[in-house]
Amino acid sequence: MSWFTPELIEILISVLKAVVILLVVVTCGAFMSFGERRLLGLFQNRYGPNRVGWGGSLQLVADMIKMFFKEDWVPRFSDRAIFTLAPVIAFTSLLLSFAIVPVSPTWAVADLNIGILFFLMMAGLAVYAVLFAGWSSNNKYSLLGAMRASAQTLSYEVFLGLSLMGVVAQAGSFNMQDIVNSQEHVWNVIPQFFGFVTFAIAGVAVCHRHPFDQPEAEQELADGYHIEYSGMKFGLFFVGEYIGIVTVSALIVTLFFGGWQGPFLPPFIWFALKTAFFMVMFILIRASLPRPRYDQVMSFGWKVCLPLTLLNLLATAAVILYNAQ
């Protein structure tokens, strides 16, 4: 009896697809750091990294080698186990968040019926990594940064979840494939424009990206909750942040811009082009907006984003009830 049954072959193909997708995501997250530095250089009328390799193309490799050989230092009075666990949780939770995103009609790591809930669960798990990093470092700046990050993330995750409820109500499913298929005629960005705006803002805040990078503000907290990290532990936080940008960009495309749908080109090409556009938008936002105060960030969330998401949800419910009559 052969070991290679049709069921086993199907499982191996699914595992291979998952490995390929996740490796591509990690690679995109790593290369985005180089792309960001080049784009910021152009935006600020300077060159950016252009010495290592042709046009600076090997700068990322040089940074990886440098980071790999840096001393993996642990503070003397820190909680070593939790200090080591924090970057692993951060990297893993952000990477697994991409698992529910369908790259094409046949390519996805996991086709879950509760796909959106899985993403929100992974986003909530990432908060523990920040808290663990701040608490275990035994550093006042790390702890202050962790407290800022946890309060900001938990607050904006409320708006993140509520902004998606209109999309779920229209599609009638939490499954990402069903949501993409429901946009065959009209992308969700048109009927769910306020939901899209709120989701994009909350996505930037949850990723702790500028202008919502108060937990890592160098001028105030000296890099916040990962001030004590070095070597590959810092590298996991660093790459994890860019993986978060890739994931949020991919979710914006999937939920509001038709996912892989588009004329002429193959589905995965359309998905990649749309996702790359929003990744560039993340970078341009960093280049063009100032950093507000922390109290202004929290006030904006509860006084602007929350009413906007509730208004969008009420309007969506009213339209669905009207069409059902």
Swiss-Prot record:
NDH-1 is composed of 13 different subunits. Subunits NuoA, H, J, K, L, M, N constitute the membrane sector of the complex. It is an enzyme of class 7 (translocase). GO terms for biological process: aerobic respiration. Belongs to the complex I subunit 1 family. It comes from Yersinia enterocolitica serotype O:8 / biotype 1B (strain NCTC 13174 / 8081). The gene is nuoH. It comes from the Bacteria. This is NADH-quinone oxidoreductase subunit H. One of its GO terms (molecular function) is oxidoreductase activity, acting on NAD(P)H, quinone or similar compound as acceptor. It is found in: Cell inner membrane. Its main location: membrane. PANTHER family: NADH DEHYDROGENASE SUBUNIT 1, NADH-UBIQUINONE OXIDOREDUCTASE CHAIN 1. Its EC number is 7.1.1.-. It catalyses: a quinone + NADH + 5 H(+)(in) = a quinol + NAD(+) + 4 H(+)(out). Pfam families: NADHdh. NDH-1 shuttles electrons from NADH, via FMN and iron-sulfur (Fe-S) centers, to quinones in the respiratory chain. The immediate electron acceptor for the enzyme in this species is believed to be ubiquinone. Couples the redox reaction to proton translocation (for every two electrons transferred, four hydrogen ions are translocated across the cytoplasmic membrane), and thus conserves the redox energy in a proton gradient. This subunit may bind ubiquinone. Keywords: Cell inner membrane, Cell membrane, Membrane, NAD, Quinone, Translocase, Transmembrane, Transmembrane helix, Ubiquinone. HAMAP family: NDH1_NuoH. Signal peptide: none annotated. The chain crosses the membrane at residues 11-31, 81-101, 114-134, 154-174, 186-206, 237-257, 265-285, 304-324.
